[in-house]
Each structure stands twice: as C-alpha cells, then as structure tokens.
Amino acid sequence: MLKEEDKIFTNLHGQQSHDLKSSKKRGDWDNTKALLDKGREFIIEEVKKSGLRGRGGAGFSTGMKWSFMPKNSAKPCYLVVNADESEPGTCKDRDILRFEPHKLIEGCLLASFAIGANDCYIYIRGEFYNEASNIQRALDEAYKDGLIGKNACGSGFDCNIYLHRGAGAYICGEETALLESLEGKKGMPRLKPPFPAGFGLYGCPTTINNVESIAVVPTILRRGASWFASIGKPNNTGTKIFCISGHVNKPCNVEEAMGISLKELIEKYAGGVRGGWDNLKAIIPGGSSVPLLPKSLCEVDMDFDSLRTAGSGLGTGGIIVMDKSTDIIYAIARLSKFYMHESCGQCTPCREGTGWMWRVMMRLVKGNAQKSEIDELLNVTKEIEGHTICALGDAAAWPIQGLIRHFRSEIEERIKGWSSAI
C-alpha cells in the first residue's frame, strides 16, 4: 500500500486550485533549473534507473525510449505528449489534465531537454474541452513566469510547448496515427519501421509519451530513481493511477503502488463490489482492450507481469467491475461495436474482421447461433491479432478471446436456450 508521503499526484481529486501559485506550494517547479543543470544524460539515466515503464498501455521503458533519440540530429527533434485518452473505462489522464496541469508541463520541459527537443506538442482529445482550457491557462502562466519558452527557467534552454486539439478519433491514440493527425492528415497508423525516433513528426526524430509517464518525471528526478524503484515490485516499479468503474459502490481514480492486489484496490478505495465480493462476476483490469478476468482470478496483483501471467494485461489501469447482474456476452459485444466503429479501415483484417466479429457477437447475445460458431469466432480473432499495422486489431480481438476462454459455457447455454425455445 502506498504511503501518503509517496504520492506524486497530491491534487488528483481537485481539492485545491490547479493554478501556478497553488502548484508551486505542492512542490511543482521547485528549482527546476537545478535539474536541467545536471544535463541530459543524467535525466535519461535517472529515468532508466527508476524503472518507469510507459503508463499508456505498452509498458515500454520510458528512459530507454528517450535514449533512442539521436544525440546530434541535423533535423529538429520533437516531444509529443499523447493526451488523446479515449479508451473505454479509462479517465486517469483527464484528471491530470484537469487538476495537475503544471506537473505535466514541467515534465514536458524536462523530457524535451533530455531528448534535445525545443518544441513539444500536447495532443489532447477533442472532447476534453475544459481540460484543454486548463492546460492552456497553465501554459500561459508558465510562459509568463519564464518557466517555459526562451531561456526556460533561466537554464539557457529554449522550450516551446503547444496544445493541439484532436477531432474525436480513437485511432489517433495510436502514436503514428497521432503524428499523421498532428500534421493535418487523416489519422491513420504508419508502417513501422521507420520508427518515430528516426522518422516522426514532419519526418524528424520524435518521442511520443503518455500524459502520466511525463507527469511523474519531475518527482522522480527530485526524489531520486532509487525512491521510485523502491515502490512496487521488481520490473513493475513506482506508482500508478487506477480508474475503478462499473459495479462498485464508489467509482474513483486512485494513485497506488504497482503490484497492489486488485481485490484490495476495489475494497479499500471503491467501497467494494456492489452486493459484496461474492456478487462479482468478472473484471476488465486494464481498459477495454485487455481480456477480462473471471472472479476466480480477480485477486491478482495489479502490475504488468502478474496480469500477463493471468492471461490479461495492465493496459491503462482502467478497472471495469461487472457483478452477476451483467450480461457478460452483451458487455463484450458492446466493446466489439466500439472497435468496429473506431477502425480506420486501412488494414483488411481489422476493417472486415471487426464488423464480422460484432455481427457474430450479437447473434451470440441472442443465442441465435451454432455452437461451432464459437470456435469459428475464436479463430477469426486469432487471424486478426498480430496481422494489422497497429494494435487496434489486437484490442478488438482480446476481449472476445477472454470471453470465450472464461465464459464459453455461458455462451453455449445461451445457444441451447434459444434452440430449445424454437
């Protein structure tokens, strides 16, 4: 369990003002110049030592990602912050944008300095109107105070940060589709390689990081990599914001240590499952893109490795709780419809497969299908998984795979009930 003094996001629930004066009282922008004076290599190495892994879902080492940027590029380098949070069940970045904007902006400055980028873009979800307003106000305050812009914090480093609003496409959360959108084109994922670190925004070296990944950097540098690495578990270090929604008594966002038990997280912070733990049916532990877990597996630790072993994933940390009143087949069918709607249509397996899967899922919801179609559906998910340019195909396939893996008997009963009624 995370100690109060180890919390990074001390205004996560907006109890205090998010303006610059209040943010400074909470420790933001505290002698940032001294951190910059330590040099780029120090910052990258410290982030590496901390064990910070990307908080957007992939879990790749943040420091390692920064080290891929060229040291002496003839082209300008860019930092892009992915604030296009659109994953069903996920709202952690939204609260950072709302209530902790200066943590993000300070993190942008430090990360930009580390990778040699004089320009940073925050790409924010189009629907986040109020959050975009908060970020813009915070940027204006930071510019006025000399914290960013020319000679940021008096360090001699120039760093301009721009806010760019998206237009409501979930696919633009994929890093290369985001770059396409930022360039003014239709948001469609690029083939990799080349990777953004070599050929990113405007064909220049670019690093793309999640909001939470960037916002924790200033605290890591102030308190030290060893402090951050001491929280959580080996290879799964630090704190994480978890979003708990669904059939719980008190839905909430909470910052906790990586590796906390899923059951403890729900019972301590969300008031427990509606109707008690025995009324639990299943949980999606990491946003809609990861396979669900049945009640028998729901005391798993919330970290990358433990959830992978359990057959799911940490993803974004968006925990969706479903009690026994849930029509689990329809719940997953609803997610199938979401992915069908959000597919950009570039890859045939995803373009054709997501629609096909949704139509079959809706027949399974009614029971109007043959039992053989369950295996046929599973085979189609495996044909889509790993055969698309981006991970949206995987995201569409995994919820269905989880459903069939753990609730096949319920699907078969639904089919049997329909057949008996005819």
UniProtKB/Swiss-Prot annotation:
Cofactor entry: FMN; [4Fe-4S] cluster
PROSITE patterns tied to this protein: COMPLEX1_51K_1 (PS00644), COMPLEX1_51K_2 (PS00645)
Region (Disordered): 1-26
Record key words, sorted: 4Fe-4S, Flavoprotein, FMN, Iron, Iron-sulfur, Metal-binding, NAD, Quinone, Translocase
Binding positions for NAD(+) per the UniProt entry: 54-63
UniProt xrefs under Gene3D superfamilies: 3.10.20.600, NADH-ubiquinone oxidoreductase 51kDa subunit, NADH-ubiquinone oxidoreductase 51kDa subunit, iron-sulphur binding domain
Bias type Basic and acidic residues, positions: 16-26
Its EC number(s): 7.1.1.-
Reactions catalysed: a quinone + NADH + 5 H(+)(in) = a quinol + NAD(+) + 4 H(+)(out)
Domain of life: Bacteria
Annotated [4Fe-4S] cluster binding sites: 344, 347, 350, 390
A Pfam family matched in the record: Complex1_51K
Cysteine pairs bridged by disulfides in the record: none
Annotated function: NDH-1 shuttles electrons from NADH, via FMN and iron-sulfur (Fe-S) centers, to quinones in the respiratory chain. Couples the redox reaction to proton translocation (for every two electrons transferred, four hydrogen ions are translocated across the cytoplasmic membrane), and thus conserves the redox energy in a proton gradient.
Name the record gives this protein: NADH-quinone oxidoreductase subunit F
Native source species: Rickettsia felis (strain ATCC VR-1525 / URRWXCal2)
